[in-house]
Amino acid sequence: MSAMRYPGGNFAAGFHWRDGVGPRGDRPAVRELAWQSVEPNTFGTDEFVALCRKMGWMPMLTVNLGTGTPEEARDWVEYCNCPVGTREADRRAANGRSEPHAVKLWCLGNEMDGPWQLGHVPAEHYAIRAQQAAKMMKDCDRTIETVVCGSCTTSLPTWMEWDRQVLEHVGDAADYISLHRYAGNREDDTPDFLAVTAAIDRQIEEVDAACRYVQARRKSARRALLCFDEWNVWYKATGGDGQGKRAPHLIEEVYNLEDALVVAGFLNSFIRHADVVKIANIAQIVNVIAPLLTRGDGLLVQSIFHPFEMMAKRRDGVSLRVAVDGPSYTGRTNGRVPFVDASVILGEGVLHVFLTNRSERAAAPVSIEPADASIAGLESAEILTGPGPKAANSFEHPDVVAARKFDEVSVRAGRARLKLPPLSMAALSLRVG
């Protein structure tokens, strides 16, 4: 991972950053309204930034524009980014951090178009709030970049109209606009579930079209880019009421093979749209709808971890346009898609190819033919598959769905060939000359 977003999420609309700084013994425990739990504030800004530095992540902070104010957001920028000599920077120094945290990415609230959100307001009201916050925050530190709240789901009646109004009002103060999507198979329709990639592609392209429209309408040299700062599979684990407990177990989804293939589809879509999708954050990372589950001191690697890991270690390079020529099918709600989903990254002397076979029954013969290069050999290849679409890992059986070395790739006459098993995902690194 390269960036980490904190503190969320619906949590952000009730979080006041000053509660989470200073000596831990002096920090207040507060009732957290989004998830109906108790927040002890023992982990706050300084702990988060320290964790990011330790892990090599870029910190990304979400200001409270639900129950908070633009001034509170500005003060948080001062606390994090300004040299000592003023009130909030001196507060940071008094808390043991004399050097600025230099946080570059700032989200202007979370899902403010959602009626469930604390402080939800219509688009025109949020746009004023966001514009005020962005101006004050950038006046405090002109190097930061801001993410305005876009439509968090295509199902709300304000879809696209919210984005237009916000972008038109906030203008060039918005560096990015956010998108969210959680995919699910509530109808137990595996082919349609796996075709959700088509809907992800459409969502990205429609929001980008709104950004281009506003850029043209405003006659601006700048255009907001896309920040897909919440995405995942989520539909089996329900209920978000913590019943007033501290650190309750909430929405701990168990993921299976088809979920992992959908996660691969999300990532393929992001790579294909890398010219406009510049930031993407899976939600979450541990326990709550997460690739990793814990039990006591035990750790379970869930199925969705594997495509993320297989692709992350091959992420460096330039996204290439990919054309898939082969059979297709029509999902019940998501539309027509090829059986093979693909994305490609060109690194230094290496071509990284990511392939998913959506078919439940048929293996897919694949020939990889670069337009302006020749494949010289296979550097590495992995495949992810399992005994069936509902196969899942457990603490008792942790490797039911797991990645393994893939030897069935041949290179001949500048092309690579393989046969992709049903319901599988492959990641290849091919030397090119």
What function would you assign to each model-found segment?
Residues 123-266, 273, 324-335:
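Noncatalytic carbohydrate-binding groove/subsite architecture in carbohydrate-active enzymes
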Residues 2-22, 224, 232-238, 384-392:
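Short, solvent-exposed beta-strand-terminating loops
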Residues 278-350:
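Glycan-recognition and catalytic regions of carbohydrate-active enzymes
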